């Protein structure tokens, strides 16, 4: 299922955190934005643990694009990984690139600037500062990057959004 447009009203939060309504998909998002997609199920992971202490986490679901999810997270913690622990810190420019919804409208966002495409031409090529790039191909062309709070490329992982939920 392709997601070629992302707009609508958003106002749902993770883990009982304060809601952070967002009016539409686009350049109005905050700098620290985490993009991901889930093809089948809603988000089931738990937040509010010590891993996310002090972070505001927000779930953003477009009303007309049910496969796209956006997480606004000032501390930039990966919401499906338990690898990184410690105090919240801003993401240290791990990724570079741009993001586009569908076949047009490419924009750059925070978390170092993830590179990701949604829609029928969806793909992901993410680098960790230098020429260490990876590409993921997963049938339906939906992908999600992981942004860790360290500068090391060794702390970066890529997971395709296939199957039934978040990892």
Curated annotation (Swiss-Prot):
Record's keyword terms, sorted: Keratin, Repeat
Record region (2 X 17 AA approximate tandem repeats): 98-131
Sequence repeat positions: 98-114, 115-131
A Pfam family annotated for this UniProt entry: PMG
Keyword Repeat: yes
Family: Belongs to the PMG family.
Protein role: In the hair cortex, hair keratin intermediate filaments are embedded in an interfilamentous matrix, consisting of hair keratin-associated proteins (KRTAP), which are essential for the formation of a rigid and resistant hair shaft through their extensive disulfide bond cross-linking with abundant cysteine residues of hair keratins. The matrix proteins include the high-sulfur and high-glycine-tyrosine keratins.
Protein name as annotated: Keratin-associated protein 14
């Amino acid at each position: 299922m392709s997601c070629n447009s992302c707009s609508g009203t958003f106002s749902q939060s993770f883990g009982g955190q304060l809601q952070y309504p967002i009016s539409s998909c686009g350049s109005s998002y905050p700098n620290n934005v985490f993009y991901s997609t889930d093809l089948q199920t809603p988000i089931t992971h738990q937040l509010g643990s010590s891993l996310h202490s002090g972070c505001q986490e927000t779930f953003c679901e477009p009303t007309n694009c049910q496969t796209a999810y956006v997480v606004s997270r000032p501390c930039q913690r990966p919401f499906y990984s338990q690898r990184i622990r410690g105090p919240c810190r801003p993401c240290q420019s791990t990724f570079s690139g741009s993001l586009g919804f569908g076949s047009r409208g490419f924009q750059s966002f925070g978390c170092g600037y993830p590179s990701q495409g949604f829609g029928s031409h969806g793909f992901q090529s993410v680098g960790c500062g230098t020429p260490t790039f990876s590409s993921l191909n997963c049938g339906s062309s939906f992908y999600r990057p992981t942004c860790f709070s360290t500068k090391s490329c060794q702390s970066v992982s890529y997971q395709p959004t296939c199957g039934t939920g978040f990892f």
